[in-house]
């Protein structure tokens, strides 16, 4: 729905008068990502999957060129186990190429890590009755209501350091504050921030120096006999990603019939309530 300048300011009186010329209102979903991930895992376990946390792949076993086993390290206890399978799916996000190295192969695509940072501030920092979205020179900035807080972000920058610890920098925080403060009536300061968090997007690599315009689409490939890799994608397409990756793996299973995918008709646990 198109909104006039006055209509936009009624919805978000915390915006500066002189930056608003109008607005567009639309409705979207709000997802608790941690709960969603746990629910997907619980659903998989209900269907027969074995789910392990604190587990790292530290080696792959090959017979000839075919991957036939994986060495798994329990990072809590230090114990190792070996898993055998007809086919392995490498769905490790920004660690995709680390698995390729363990297999001694080079995949048809590479994955670049793009760091995204968000800040969290109390709801009274901004007077608004809806989430807000602004266009920046590089991307977009979201101001999202979350309980008693606003989540504000994000950034989009290359990350070539420790993949397990994508730390937010003062420059990241200053970037977010500078852009949101261009729009809001009362400036938000570092002192208002109650939390900062960051993560890495696994982007299928292109030729551009910047990650901003790299494809968020996913890619699936059989990188070696017995090993299928999938990378890229996003939350909203996770079932399609899943289906494509499993379909590629099924093609590499020898001497066994595999039933068709049922993901498009299988609800997550609790969805029927």
Name each model feature, range by range:
Residues 76-87, 91:
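Core beta-strand elements of the Rossmann-like FAD/NAD(P) dinucleotide-binding domain
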Residues 26, 70-74:
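Short beta-strand segments that buttress and anchor functional surface loops
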Residues 31-36, 83, 235-240:
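Substrate-binding strand-loop-helix patch
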Residues 1-42, 46-47, 52, 60-66, ...:
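Flavin (FAD/FMN) cofactor-binding and adjacent substrate-gating region
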Residues 66-71, 127-129:
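Short, hydrophobic/aromatic-rich segments at coil-to-beta transitions
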Residues 43, 101-152, 157-273:
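C-terminal catalytic lobe of FAD-dependent flavoproteins
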Residues 54-58, 74-76:
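Conserved SAM/SAH-binding loop
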């Amino acid at each position: 729905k198109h909104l006039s300048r006055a209509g936009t300011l009624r919805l978000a009186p915390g915006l500066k008068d002189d930056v608003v010329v109008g607005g567009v209102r639309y409705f979207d979903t709000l997802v608790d990502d941690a709960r969603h991930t746990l629910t997907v895992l619980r659903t998989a376990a209900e269907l027969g999957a074995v789910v392990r946390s604190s587990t790292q792949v530290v080696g792959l076993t090959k017979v000839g060129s075919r991957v036939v086993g994986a060495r798994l390290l329990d990072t809590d206890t230090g114990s190792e186990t070996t898993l055998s399978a007809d086919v392995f799916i490498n769905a490790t996000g920004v660690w995709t190429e680390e698995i390729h190295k363990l297999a001694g192969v080079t995949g048809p695509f590479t994955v670049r890590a793009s760091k995204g940072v968000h800040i969290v501030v109390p709801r009274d920092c901004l007077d608004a009755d809806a989430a807000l979205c602004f266009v920046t020179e590089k991307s977009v900035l979201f101001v999202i209501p979350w309980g008693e807080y606003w989540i504000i972000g994000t950034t989009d920058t290359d990350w070539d350091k420790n993949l397990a610890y994508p730390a937010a920098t003062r420059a990241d925080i200053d970037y977010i504050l500078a852009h949101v403060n261009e729009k809001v009536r009362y400036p938000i300061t570092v002192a208002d921030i109650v939390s900062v968090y960051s993560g890495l997007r696994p982007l299928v690599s292109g030729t551009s120096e910047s990650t901003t315009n790299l494809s968020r689409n996913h890619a699936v490939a059989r990188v070696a006999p017995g090993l299928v890799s999938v990378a890229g994608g996003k939350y909203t397409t996770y079932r399609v990603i899943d289906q494509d990756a499993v379909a590629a793996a099924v093609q590499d299973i020898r001497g066994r019939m595999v039933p068709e995918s049922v993901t498009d008709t299988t609800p997550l646990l609790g969805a029927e309530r």
